[in-house]
Structure formats: structure tokens, C-alpha cells
């Protein structure tokens, strides 16, 4: 101490207390301070010492309580809600009400915290109580009142400290106060808590005093811990405890714990779990537990006297120290020792980590004496510094009891632990076990060596080795074509079957959902017109629409899907029909399949003078795959060579039997040019529509399919959408495939703007972020955020599929493709394809895949709808590609850039010519081959010897003989000589050639063994353009 002042931390060291305990007393005495380094005057030190010694005058306490009263009032408000004390016996209530009205509410809170943990502290206090019997009651009550409160806020943190705190008999009171500083008002509130225990059920206390001591131990410990977390629980018995406890001071201590246990439902439940722990340290632990709850009771103020008297008989706190911490551990250890042998057996069997934890505890228990002594020493040392947390021991005991309960089930679960090991063993065995090799595998397309190895359950190295012996150097990431896979699989004794691809016309999505059932309305039918090229599909549609669309088609053939609306009058009512016109050229298979997938009725147009053709059969298969009704329109019946009956006969062979022949297929002979039987055809369409019962819900967000899409240089991405359910409106946010867009405008088939598109309505939509793929389904979303998330995820999926396709394109076949590539003989034709609409791009790419690519491979660097731009020209110049445009134009500056870069730009409007030119370009990349061209045949009729050689006198039988041409000399069936005609003379003069019917002389430098009758074949080698080999 310097100058009569003492720092708080020095005072706490002197008193063997925590700094926070002294700070709590300062709060109670209203002594100002900033931290534990603050100084106290001599008077303030005296006051603190008096409070901590339990002899402090009641005035500071009263002052503290007065200061705390406002805070207590707040808690009183909270407690009062739960406090309805009328539940307790009416006799006890009046006494409690008379004592502390303000503290009654706190009493409810306090029983929860104080009852179990505070007993040890109280036990220490009674030792000093005998010196001042009157005062200790009140002084002990207040510190203890503080003690119960701190546990409530920090119940979870200090449970372990409980055993050590009971040791200091003189200090426990100040310790309680130290924890109290955080909630000063709480001290007053918790005073009634102790009373609550005693009052909890006075009837029971009087009825059965003997069993209560046991129950007291269990509920007290559990009761304080649990109520601390949930303070409102204590509110039920606040009023009862105050006065009933005082009259029965000596008897109350045992009864109070019991009442606490029974009074509150929570303690009762806790008692069930706690009994195990209290039972283990029965002799020493019992009194200790009783002592702890009793100090909680003094919180009321007057009850302290009773509690002090009771605690005085049990001053030896030393027993408490070992019993609370050490003995609960001993029973566990003793109990676990019985399982030592079992645990050892479990180790061998390979038990789980839980069993290992038990074993560790058992191993620690081997030195019981050493551990006990060490624990006792630690408990004694901690007790000097611990105070209020004595309430916590109950909590540790609760968890301890729970583990004990948990351990018991673990014994029952032992077989489960063993089963886990067995499961691991089984998995190990399964890994070691070789999987069964399949006898049959099914393929849809090419696959990589790695995928094939997994499918065949064969090591990848074995497949690579097999390919190597076939002359193919492959890696695990290279793709094998189906023919190669079949040969490899055959080596391993596995059969291969090819899966049939699903038709593109199959309907995969149900547009009308169950939720739409209550709002369904009839919708117009969607009718798709299909058939072979030049059979009159568009002309028939023109006759129906009374327009002339066909005249505007390039080459007179349709190369897009067109959507048209037609109003038809039937039985006096106006009906609307939506027609989809599909191209008939073989390159547009995907378009026809797409049209069939979204259609309700299919019209098959067959020319009466041409009959069933390849695309007719394809259209039939699309209609069957889409499971839509089919109406046959036999067109061009006005021609003289028309044979409708022959067409019906041909269709019968493919399962389409006309109604007049006893079948179910409607067949109508029509003439598109003359307009004959058009009304009959429309009537049949409406009749079939009535049978189909086509419905949709126009009151929901729109869903449908992208029929066609293209990039317009003025309007941006434009898509033709067919609404199949719901209503599409301007401003809707939609996702088509992986493309996000917001509808800015909609245009119908006649070019008029519309604000809404109802079911079965086809419109051109502006406002998409990119050109969607034709055939993609679109859906309208309520908010842009969710729509963007869907579009992003779909874009990622498409990116992955493109990567897989790129890997698959690096295919390896049994031919000489890989060898040619290594030798530089494999040629590539790089193309950049731009078309007017997405469907045309799709059709051209499909046609290019059909071209033979053994000698020359076509690499499409870019395929997209839209006009040819300077960017395309730059890409073509960098990669040596040819730009191919289909029904598109060049952007400004693109033509000049192409001329400067020397890029070849081709534009086409008919797909026939485009494919022919691309095939010709592929053939042009091939090295020309030398072909033998026969010139003529010459017969040797005489042989003239000249010097060391000989000259043959010949007659040209056919063709001609040309000097320096190639010749073959044949004698009978034998080839005598092959070489060059070195000298050719006629009438002793050198000539260039001799025609048939003339005689000539032929001399060779390296051959002179002529004989009469020899035949000389003259020929020459010419270069000929190579064609693509299939």
C-alpha cells in the first residue's frame, strides 16, 4: 500500500481472491473504479474487507441493494410474467410477500442457478457463521444471493471450477459477490431463488422428509444449471420459498433441495440423470451437495440464518473437495474397469473411435491413487480462487451423468462398431475382388479409350496394346469409332450392340402441368405440313392462306420453317389453325423433326405423279415418333399422269391404310394450284382437332419451343417462338436454351406487332441476348435473377458437351487416317459458315458430316447465323479458311477486308450448290493422280537390223502412235518390254505421230529383240482429279 491507497489487484492477492470478485464487491458498495489497477482508499478497503469477511454493516448492503433495485425491477418485469406464484401453497405465500416484494421475482430466477452449485459455498460460510450467528444470516445471504446469480449468465463456462471453490470456507461469500457485479440487480432477484426451492412444494417437504435428501442432491445440481440457461423456469415457485424456509431452519436444508427438485419440472427431469453421480459419492457427496444448495437459499436475506445453522454441522469442506471432482470420476473409472477386458477384446476386433476413447480413459485410471491425490491437490488450490462458480459443479455432473448413460448404450452398440469394421473389411475385399466383365456392351457413338476400358472392365493398357498391334497408336483420351470398338471388344470376348438414337421428333416435355388443370381452355391446333421436296407443300399452304409464298423461295424450295395463322369458318364459327411449313430437302431433317415435335396434327403431302419418296418416309417416321395424328394430302391430282390409287397402295405398305379401304388414315386428294378440295382438307383438320381435345392454360407464364432463330443486322437476335402453354407478353423475362432475354417486341406472321401471344400462337421475338438454337424450349421466369442462374447453368453444360464433342472429333479409325496425318497426307478444309437462320446452319452442318472425309476432313471453325463481318474475315485470314455464306450478306467493310486479305468468300442461296462446291473444294485439296490414257495399238510386221540394233516395221491398227509416248510390247500373252517410244519415222522421216491405217518405223534405244507379230500398245499418263472415297 502506497500513501494509504491500495490497488484492487493487490487487495485481491492479499485476500486470495480473483480480481473480479473484489470488483463485484466494489460494484455493490458503489465504489468507483476503472479497472483492477484502480486504487482504493483505506476506508474503501475497510468496507470491502468487512463485506468479504461477512461482518459488514447492513448499510452498504442496503445501499447496494438500493442501487441494484432498478435493475432488479427490470428482471422483476421479466420474472413476473412467469412468476404467477398462486400455484404454490397459499399459506407460504403471505410470509414471502411480507418479506421482500421486490426480491420475490428474483427468487424465481435464483432457484435455478443457486440451488445446485451454491451449496458448497454455503457450506464454507457456516464455518464462520458460529462467530456471529445473527449477522451471518444476513451477510451470508447477500453474498450468496450474489453467488447464485453469476452462475446464471456463465453457467456453461464455470462448471469445472465447482469442486475447487468449496475449499475456502471464509472466502465463499466474497466470491459470490465477485460474479455478481455483472448483473447487480440480479443479486436481489436471485435471493428469492433459494426460497423458491424450500417453498417449491412445502406439502411434499412435510409429507416425505426422508427421501428428499436424495432428491435434493439430484435436482439441486441439475436445477441450478438448467434454470441458469432458462431463467424464466424459476418463476413458478418464487413466492413460496421465502417464509416457509425460515421457520424450519434446521429441517429446511434437507427439504429445500427436495422441494426444488419436485417443484420445478426441469429439476425433476434432471434428477433422473443426476442420480447416478450422487449415488456414487453417497457418503461424502451427499452432505456436500446439500450444503451447496443451502447457500443459494440465503439469497432471500433472512433465510441465511437457517442455512448457516444447517451448514455449521458440516464445516469440513475438505470432504467436499475430493468427493465432488474425484469421486464422480472414481465411480466411472471403477465402472469402466469392469469393461477393461471387453475393451481389449474390442481393440482386437477393431472397434470404432468411441471405444478407443473409453480405452484411453481406462488407461488413465490405472494409477488411481496418484490421480486422486493430484486431483485433491488441484481442487484445494483452485478452491482458493474460485467462489461463485460452485453452482457449476452440478452442470459438470449433469454432463457426466449423460456420458454414463451414453456409455451404457455404447455397450449395446458394440456390435454396430464391429459391423463398421466389418463393413470396411468388406469394402476392402470388394476392391480386391475383380469386377465381373460384361458379356455385352451397348454403344450409341464413339467413345474414348478410357471410357471403353471402364465399360468393358478391362485395363486401359490392354486396350492400347490391342490397338497398337492393329497399327493404331492411341492414348487414353483419344476416341475410337464404333468399328474399332467392335474389333477391340471381340478380342476380349465381348459383344457390341449399337443403341438406336431417339427420334428428334419425340416429345420429351409435357407443356401442360397438373397445376394447370383448373384453368384449361381450348386452344387452336398446330398443324405441320411435311413431305418430299417439290411435292407442293408450300403451294398447298399458299392455297390455304391465299398468298404466294412459294414464288419467293430461292430455287422454288423451302429452306425455313414458316409459321402461319389461318382463320377458317366451320359450322358458322370462326376457328384458327396454326400451320408450320417445313422444308422437304434431305438436309433439313432436323427441321422436320422439330416441326413434328411441336405439332398437334401432321399433314403428309404426297405428289400423285411421284409417289412415296425418301423424305416422305422420313416424315412418316417423324409423325409416328411424335405420336400425332396424320392426314395425307395427295397433291397434284389435276395432272394427267396423277395416280392417286397407286399412292394409296404405296402408303399402305408403310402402315397408312386409307379409311375407304378399312383403315384409320384420312386421305384427301387435292390440287393446290386449282384449289380443289382445300375446304375438305380444312374440315378434316378441324374434325381431328375436336377428337384430340387440345387445351392449355392462358393464365400462367408462357412456355414453348423455339421454331427458328437468326441474327438480323438491324434488329439483333430474332427468334420465332411457338407458345404452347401460358401467355407471352412484352416485357417478360425468358430463357431459351442457354440464352437469356427480355421480350422487347413481338411480330406475328403478317408483320403486325402484338402485345401478347396466347397458346398455339407463333411470333417473332426481339430482345434476346444471343441467337438460341432452333428446337430449344423456352420458359418465362418471374424475376431476372433466377432466369440468369438457369441460363448460366445451361451454358456451362453446353460448354462441357462441346468439349466432349471436340474430343470425340479426334477419332481414331482402323483406316490410315492417323498414319496419313503423321505423314502430312491428311488434308483439312477450314470453313467459316454464316447463314440466315439457325436452322440453315444446322442443316448445312448435318450435310457436311455426310461427306466422305477419309482423305480430306472438314473443320468448321465458326458456324452461326448472321451476316459476314470483318471479324469473320480476320479469322479466315488467320486460319486459311473459306467463308461460306448461305442466304446472308456481307457487312459494311467485310468485302474490302476480304479482298485485302485474299480470303475466299462464297455466297449461296440454294443448299444443293453449296454442298457441291464444298465437295469440289475438298477434292481440289487432293493430289491429282496419274491415270493411263490408251492411245492406240501397233502391230510389228517386219524387223530390220541396223548396226547393232534393230528397227520394227509396224502398222498402226487403231488409235495412233506418238513419239515419246509410253509403250508396252506384248508377245502373245506375255509382256516383253515397257518403256518409251524413242524414234518414230515414216518414209525415212521423223514424225511426231502416226495415225491409224498408216505404216511407220519404231526404234527403241534399250530394246531390239523384235519379232514379227508383236503388239505394241501405246499410251500416255495424264493427271486426273481425284474424287473423295466413301
From Swiss-Prot:
Region (G1): 531-538
Biased composition (Low complexity): 56-69, 111-132, 154-164, 259-273
Pfam families: EF-G_D2, GTP_EFTU, IF-2, IF2_N
SUPFAM superfamilies in the record: Initiation factor IF2/eIF5b, domain 3, P-loop containing nucleoside triphosphate hydrolases, Translation proteins
Cross-referenced PROSITE patterns: G_TR_2, IF2
Domain tr-type G as annotated: residue spans: 522-695
Molecular function terms, GO-annotated: GTP binding; GTPase activity; translation initiation factor activity
UniProt keyword list: Cytoplasm, GTP-binding, Initiation factor, Nucleotide-binding, Protein biosynthesis
Region (G4): 635-638
Region entry G3, spans: 581-584
Keyword check for Protein biosynthesis: yes
Main subcellular localisation: cytoplasm
Location within or outside the cell: Cytoplasm
One Gene Ontology cellular component annotation held by this UniProt entry: cytosol
Region annotation (G2) ranges: 556-560
Positions of disulphide bridges: none
Chain spans, region G5: 671-673
Similarity section: Belongs to the TRAFAC class translation factor GTPase superfamily. Classic translation factor GTPase family. IF-2 subfamily.
Described function: One of the essential components for the initiation of protein synthesis. Protects formylmethionyl-tRNA from spontaneous hydrolysis and promotes its binding to the 30S ribosomal subunits. Also involved in the hydrolysis of GTP during the formation of the 70S ribosomal complex.
Protein name in the entry: Translation initiation factor IF-2
Species in which this protein is naturally found: Synechococcus elongatus (strain ATCC 33912 / PCC 7942 / FACHB-805)
Gene responsible for this protein: infB
Amino acid at each position: 500500500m502506497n500513501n494509504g491507497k491500495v490497488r484492487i489487484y493487490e487487495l485481491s492477492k492479499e485476500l486470495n481472491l480473483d480480481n473480479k470478485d473484489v470488483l463485484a464487491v466494489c460494484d455493490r458498495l458503489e465504489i468507483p473504479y476503472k479497472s483492477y489497477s484502480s486504487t482504493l482508499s483505506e476506508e474503501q478497503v475497510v468496507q470491502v474487507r468487512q463485506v468479504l469477511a461477512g461482518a459488514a454493516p447492513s448499510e452498504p448492503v442496503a445501499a447496494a441493494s438500493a442501487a441494484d433495485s432498478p435493475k432488479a425491477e427490470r428482471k422483476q418485469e421479466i420474472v413476473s410474467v412467469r412468476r404467477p406464484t398462486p400455484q404454490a401453497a397459499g399459506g407460504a405465500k403471505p410470509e414471502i410477500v411480507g418479506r421482500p416484494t421486490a426480491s420475490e421475482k428474483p427468487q424465481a430466477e435464483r432457484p435455478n442457478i443457486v440451488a445446485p452449485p451454491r451449496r458448497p459455498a454455503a457450506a464454507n460460510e457456516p464455518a464462520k457463521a458460529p462467530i456471529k450467528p445473527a449477522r451471518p444470516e444476513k451477510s451470508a445471504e447477500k453474498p450468496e444471493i450474489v453467488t447464485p446469480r453469476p452462475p446464471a449468465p456463465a453457467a456453461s463456462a464455470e462448471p469445472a471450477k465447482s469442486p475447487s471453490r468449496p475449499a475456502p470456507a471464509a472466502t465463499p461469500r466474497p466470491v459470490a459477490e465477485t460474479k455478481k457485479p455483472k448483473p447487480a440487480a440480479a443479486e436481489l432477484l436471485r435471493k428469492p431463488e433459494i426460497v423458491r426451492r424450500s417453498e417449491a412444494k412445502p406439502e411434499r417437504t412435510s409429507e416425505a422428509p426422508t427421501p428428499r435428501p436424495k432428491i435434493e442432491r439430484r435436482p439441486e445440481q441439475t436445477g441450478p444449471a438448467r434454470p441458469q440457461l432458462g431463467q424464466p423456469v424459476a418463476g413458478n415457485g418464487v413466492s413460496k420459498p421465502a417464509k416457509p424456509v425460515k421457520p424450519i431452519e434446521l429441517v429446511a436444508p434437507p427439504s429445500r433441495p427436495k422441494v426444488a427438485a419436485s417443484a420445478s419440472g426441469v429439476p425433476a427431469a434432471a434428477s433422473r440423470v443426476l442420480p447416478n453421480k450422487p449415488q456414487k459419492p453417497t457418503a461424502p457427496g451427499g452432505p456436500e451437495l446439500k450444503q451447496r444448495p443451502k447457500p443459494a437459499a440465503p439469497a432471500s436475506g433472512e433465510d441465511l440464518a437457517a442455512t448457516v445453522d444447517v451448514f455449521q454441522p458440516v464445516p469440513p469442506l475438505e470432504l467436499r473437495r475430493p468427493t465432488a471432482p474425484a469421486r464422480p470420476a472414481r465411480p466411472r473409472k471403477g465402472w469402466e474397469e469392469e469393461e477393461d477386458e471387453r475393451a481389449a477384446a474390442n481393440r482386437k476386433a477393431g472397434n470404432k473411435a468411441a471405444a478407443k476413447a473409453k480405452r484411453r480413459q481406462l488407461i488413465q485410471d490405472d494409477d488411481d491413487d496418484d490421480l486422486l491425490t493430484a486431483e485433491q491437490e488441484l481442487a484445494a488450490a483452485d478452491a482458493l480462487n474460485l467462489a461463485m462458480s460452485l453452482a457449476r459443479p452440478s452442470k459438470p455432473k449433469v454432463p457426466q451423468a449423460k456420458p454414463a448413460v451414453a456409455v451404457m448404450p455404447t455397450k449395446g452398440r458394440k456390435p454396430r462398431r464391429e459391423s463398421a469394421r466389418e463393413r470396411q473389411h468388406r469394402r476392402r475385399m470388394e476392391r480386391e475382388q475383380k469386377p465381373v466383365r460384361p458379356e455385352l456392351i451397348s454403344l450409341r457413338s464413339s467413345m474414348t479409350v478410357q471410357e471403353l476400358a471402364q465399360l468393358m472392365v478391362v485395363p486401359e493398357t490392354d486396350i492400347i496394346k490391342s490397338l497398337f498391334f492393329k497399327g493404331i497408336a492411341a492414348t487414353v483420351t483419344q476416341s475410337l469409332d464404333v468399328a474399332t470398338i467392335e474389333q477391340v471388344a471381340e478380342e476380349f470376348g465381348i459383344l457390341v450392340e449399337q443403341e438406336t438414337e431417339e427420334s428428334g421428333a419425340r416429345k420429351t416435355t409435357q407443356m401442360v402441368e397438373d397445376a394447370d388443370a383448373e384453368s384449361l381452355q381450348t386452344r387452336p391446333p398446330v398443324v405441320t405440313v411435311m413431305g418430299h421436296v417439290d411435292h407442293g407443300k408450300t403451294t398447298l399452304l399458299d392455297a390455304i392462306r391465299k398468298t404466294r409464298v412459294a414464288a419467293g423461295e430461292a430455287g422454288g424450295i423451302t429452306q425455313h420453317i414458316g409459321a402461319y395463322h389461318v382463320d377458317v369458318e366451320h359450322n358458322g364459327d370462326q376457328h384458327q389453325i396454326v400451320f408450320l411449313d417445313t422444308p422437304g430437302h434431305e438436309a433439313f431433317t432436323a427441321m422436320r423433326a422439330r416441326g413434328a415435335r411441336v405439332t398437334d396434327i401432321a399433314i403428309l403431302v404426297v405428289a400423285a405423279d411421284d409417289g412415296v419418296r425418301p423424305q416422305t418416309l422420313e416424315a412418316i417416321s417423324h409423325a409416328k415418333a411424335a405420336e400425332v395424328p396424320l392426314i395425307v394430302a395427295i397433291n397434284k391430282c389435276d395432272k394427267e399422269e396423277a395416280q392417286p390409287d397407286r399412292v394409296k397402295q404405296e402408303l399402305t405398305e408403310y402402315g397408312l391404310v386409307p379409311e375407304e379401304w378399312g383403315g384409320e388414315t384420312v386421305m384427301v386428294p387435292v390440287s393446290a394450284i386449282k384449289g380443289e378440295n382445300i375446304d375438305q382438307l380444312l374440315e378434316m383438320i378441324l374434325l381431328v382437332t375436336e377428337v384430340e381435345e387440345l387445351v392449355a392454360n392462358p393464365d400462367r407464364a408462357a412456355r414453348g419451343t423455339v421454331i427458328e432463330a437468326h441474327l438480323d443486322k438491324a434488329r439483333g437476335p430474332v427468334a420465332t417462338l411457338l407458345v404452347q402453354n401460358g401467355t407471352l407478353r412484352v416485357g417478360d423475362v425468358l430463357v431459351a436454351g442457354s440464352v437469356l432475354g427480355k421480350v422487347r417486341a413481338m411480330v406475328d406472321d403478317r408483320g403486325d406487332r402484338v402485345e401478347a401471344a396466347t397458346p398455339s400462337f407463333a411470333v417473332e421475338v426481339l430482345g434476346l441476348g444471343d441467337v438460341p438454337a432452333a428446337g430449344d424450349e423456352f420458359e418465362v421466369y418471374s424475376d431476372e435473377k433466377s432466369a440468369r442462374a438457369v441460363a448460366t447453368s445451361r451454358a456451362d453444360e453446353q460448354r462441357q458437351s462441346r468439349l466432349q464433342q471436340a474430343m470425340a472429333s479426334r477419332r481414331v479409325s482402323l483406316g490410315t487416317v492417323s498414319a496419313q496425318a503423321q505423314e502430312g497426307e491428311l488434308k483439312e478444309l477450314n470453313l467459316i459458315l454464316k447463314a440466315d437462320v439457325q436452322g440453315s446452319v444446322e442443316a448445312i452442318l448435318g450435310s457436311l458430316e455426310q461427306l466422305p472425309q477419309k482423305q480430306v476432313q472438314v473443320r468448321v471453325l465458326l458456324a452461326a447465323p448472321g451476316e459476314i463481318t470483318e471479324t469473320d474475315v480476320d479469322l479466315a485470314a488467320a486460319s486459311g479458311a473459306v467463308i461460306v455464306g448461305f442466304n446472308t450478306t456481307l457487312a459494311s467493310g467485310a468485302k474490302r477486308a476480304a479482298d485485302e486479305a485474299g480470303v475466299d468468300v462464297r455466297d449461296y442461296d440454294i443448299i444443293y450448290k453449296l454442298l457441291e462446291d464444298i465437295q469440289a473444294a475438298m477434292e481440289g485439296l487432293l493430289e491429282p493422280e496419274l491415270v493411263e490414257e490408251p492411245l492406240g495399238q501397233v502391230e510389228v510386221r517386219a524387223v530390220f537390223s541396223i548396226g547393232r540394233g534393230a528397227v520394227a516395221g509396224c502398222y498402226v491398227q487403231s488409235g495412233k502412235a506418238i513419239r515419246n509416248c509410253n509403250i508396252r510390247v506384248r508377245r502373245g500373252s506375255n509382256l516383253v518390254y515397257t518403256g518409251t517410244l524413242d524414234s518414230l519415222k515414216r518414209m525415212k522421216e521423223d514424225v511426231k505421230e502416226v495415225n491409224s491405217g498408216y505404216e511407220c518405223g519404231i526404234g527403241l534405244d534399250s530394246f531390239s529383240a523384235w519379232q514379227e507379230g508383236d503388239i505394241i500398245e501405246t499410251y500416255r499418263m495424264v493427271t486426273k482429279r481425284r474424287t473423295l472415297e466413301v
